[in-house]
Amino acid sequence: MGNIDRPRRLHKVVITAPTAMPNSEQVRLRQLARDAYSLMCKDGVQRNPIDVCPAPESIEAQPIYNINGWRDWSYDEATACQLVYLFAEVQERYGGDARSLFDLRGKPRVDMAGKGFDGNVLTIGSIDVGAGTTDLMICSYGINAIGRVTPVPLFWDSFYLAGDDIMRSIVQNLILDGGARGDIKSGTISSVLQARLKTMTNEQFEQRLNNTNIESQRIDIVNILRASSDESRAVAIENYGYDLMFDYFGGDTANNSDKDRRCRVDFNSQISVPIASYMLQLFSDNRAQRDISFNDVFAKHKPAKYLLDHFRNHFGFSFEDIIWEYRPEKLAKEIRKIMTPLMEQLSILLHAFDVDIVMLAGRPTKLPALTDLFLKFYPVSPDRLIRLPEYEVGNWYPFSHGTGEITDQKTIVAVGAYIGYLASHGGGIRGFNLDMSYLAKEMGVTANYIGKYIPRNHRVDPTMFTPTNPTVNLHIDSFPFIFGCKQLDTPVYESRPLYVMEWIGQGNAPMDLTVMISRSFQDNKEKLIIEDAYDRQGGNHKSNIRLREQSLVDSQSGDGNCWLDNGSFKYLKK
């Protein structure tokens, strides 16, 4: 793919993005990269000029009626994954003859024939499950009049349900909470805590009473000491255990000091996530069930001592003593619980577009439970299902084993973008040429329907803005108000957050506020504008309200705080 004798100089930086990332964020991402390079050049050191691709101005949203406007391909991640597969198949298995591949694996399509692509075309449906988003791209590939392979997008979208959500579910239910074995060493933090509390004497509880100034915990301990029966004592102990868990993992409260908050965040990144990652790696490797010790997970990199001390001081026992249960069936259950609604929805879309090849990409697709879940809803013959984590891409790939398998899944998007750029500029790669004009022209934003966003189930309800309804008079009784968007107007379609509307005026917002909001579906369907805002007495409050772009909303807290950043789990409330 290159000349080893030629000095390497960086001339161009290609930046990819999730397939349906809001257009304003896509533009800003590339502009920030350009600004970063400009800032670096202020040190006076002579450097080669570097271009950012795609250029921010080349991917800005354009009015639907501007048919002559030029746009670049957005270098979306799902299409980049498809290009790795397509290039490998054409070059490694079909001797550079894309037509042979299309004739063997594809079929004629009426929608492609209408664009001038006669004969067989290959339609690939790819699901790229990343950490933060799951990207869908359904794309047909034909050969144009001058022999270039031409991708034509049929359907695309991004869903904010992915690997991080699987990780959170495992941390919540297999590491922090869940389980009631009654074992003082084996289980989850909650189950081990409850088992240990049940063995404590009144003298030990009295000592804890003297060592805590948290009122809720003091009340729990007093109830334990005053319990008139074994049953009431058991209930009081259970409540005390809940409060200990909530005060440590449940989010910011008046009981938390600054040290408590920092330790909760660090516990998440240094302890909880590494244990969950260790379990997922065992699951990916099809390991049998086993128990996991502290030294199994942290053999090389142990958590900071202050974290372990803080845990011991709060809960009364050493974290290092816990034995974790790795049970493959439990991990599979968590994966199914999180991903079933989305996999079912994606399967319907793949079936509707009658794809020839189904591709699963991203590290989570190495998990057998995720593939099994997909096949439950979309049965497909083995030769039509491509799992990129196991695909023999060939030795040309920069990050491959000697057998041609990809060693690092995170490189797939980068290599796919590299192929997309080189094959569509100049002379292509080894005779492999791409015409990206349809991708650039037709891949627009997907926010067809906008309405009130419900974080807990990723839904928009009710739908307010439609292609034919450009203006909404919204009655607001509380702030913030979150807007979400979706491509299809069906009740179960996965939606994503887009804006948050906030009160920025002095004092409290009026209880009954009417806000007039508009958007132009033809000009920029993602852009909302506040036209007017007034209260029941007719007072104008337009200047006191702000629409702020916000594409990340936590499904538990309902705000922009991510569990990976703050380590809190709202479900721990009683």
Predicted regions: what they are:
Residues 58, 62, 66, 70-91, ...:
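Glycine-rich phosphate-binding/hydrolytic loop that grips phosphoryl groups
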Residues 90-148, 360, 417:
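Gly/Thr-rich phosphate-binding beta-strand-loop-beta motif of the actin/hexokinase/Hsp70
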Residues 1-24, 30-34, 574:
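Conserved phosphate-binding loops in N-terminal lobes of ATP-dependent enzymes
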Residues 1-5, 82-115, 309-355, 370-373:
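Phosphate/ATP-binding catalytic cores across multiple sugar-kinase/actin-like superfamilies
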Residues 3, 19, 30-120:
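Hydrophobic, small-residue-rich alpha-helical packing segments that form membrane-like cores
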Residues 330, 334-353, 366-369, 448-574:
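Terminal low-complexity/disordered tails
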Residues 28-38, 366-387:
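Conserved helicase motor "Helicase C" RecA-like lobe of SF1/SF2 P-loop NTPases
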Residues 19, 138-313, 420, 426-503, ...:
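Phosphate-binding glycine-rich/basic clefts of nucleotide- and phosphate-handling proteins
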